[in-house]
Amino acid sequence: MTTTQVLLDSLLANKASINLATTEQKNQALSAMADQLVAQTEAILAGNAIDMEHAQGKISQVMQDRLLLTEERIEAMADGIRALIGLPDPVGLVLEESTRADGLNICKKSIPFGLVGMIYESRPNVTSDAAALAIKSGNAVILRGGKEAFHSAKAIVTALKSGLEEAGVSPKVIELVQDTSRVSATELMTAKGKIDLLVPRGGAGLIQAVVENATVPVIETGTGICHVYVDKDADLDKALRIVVNAKTSRPSVCNAAEVLLVHEEIASQFLPRLEEALSGQVELRADSQAQALLNQARPAGDQDFDTEFLDYIMAVKVVSSVEEAISHIAQHSTGHSEAIVTENSQTAEHFTLHVDSAAVYVNASTRFTDGGEFGLGCELGISTQKMHARGPMGLREMTTYKYIITGDGHIR
């Protein structure tokens, strides 16, 4: 039996302690987990320093920033856990209830999944976010992070387990897989009958591998080829702020904009202003119409409109209408987040109606697609599928339901 299988069996043996925990018990656990994260900052930073040293020359500067932990980022992780305490318990909610004419009562009630698995890559904060969401929603969780962030994740899980123990909750309801090879990932994907839900979070290759090979239920958190469309009726000052923010505020995350579509009637006014505002910070890869209006853009290649750059790179295209923008998005989007900038309410309504993505914005940056920004607390990921969960996966999406039928000697 492998170490991963041993962890799974241990989680199965202990999951009832969190599946059946009261709201008070779960909130006490979260509070202690957050406190221990801060208390063990030194150990977490030491683990992160090892990961950062290993990352030198192997991943981009943008991805290194994604990996980096600081005291401030650890405090933010703790704050994310504390934010969950104030949110309603998603377990035990009466979703639907009816009583038949013969007196038989049928109640649909929310319950935890049981044991949730998470496969992710190089962002250390995902470790604490996933664990905290699992605890609040009453789930045990097995975490399998990438090798790039292993020492960071190990230190974080140690702190979280200390918090659970301090609060009187079994620390054996959170486990980190020590093996970061493909073997352990495959073991989780095929742990049918043990893992109730598996969520992959990372690049397109990881997500595709899980979706194609898993025999356990999966929620796909898709890559983010996010678009911003600047309409002919846009306020160009507003558009400039939105595009710059959507691309540059944190380019390594999935809600950053990767493609800019600009209406031909305002392209000559807007694109030179955008290029100036970006000050050479972003490499623009433009179609022929856009390139003619820009000084330093390079020609867009065949794959540029289908690439999640996660870097200071943006594909740019000039379109003749909102319909062409919608058509382009339908062809190239991953269904994550899209935005329109326009002062025309009819055009905005047309865009939101016809763009089929998890989050569609009017006059706002795509960077808001986030559990915290949506008032959901931290998130497990951004689901781009349509069944069960779509958009930021918060507490409610970490539950399923069962029917409780109460009678008085009823027979059929």
Swiss-Prot record:
| Main EC class the enzyme belongs to | oxidoreductase
What's an example GO cellular component term for this entry?
cytoplasm
Enzyme nomenclature, EC number:
1.2.1.41
- Spell out the molecular function terms from Gene Ontology: glutamate-5-semialdehyde dehydrogenase activity; NADP binding
**Location relative to the cell:** Cytoplasm
What Gene3D superfamilies does the database record attribute to this sequence? Aldehyde Dehydrogenase, Chain A, domain 1, Aldehyde Dehydrogenase, Chain A, domain 2
Report the PANTHER family cross-referenced here: DELTA-1-PYRROLINE-5-CARBOXYLATE SYNTHASE, GLUTAMATE SEMIALDEHYDE DEHYDROGENASE
Q: Report the family membership.
A: Belongs to the gamma-glutamyl phosphate reductase family.
State what protein this is by name: Gamma-glutamyl phosphate reductase
Which species expresses this protein natively? Streptococcus suis (strain 05ZYH33)
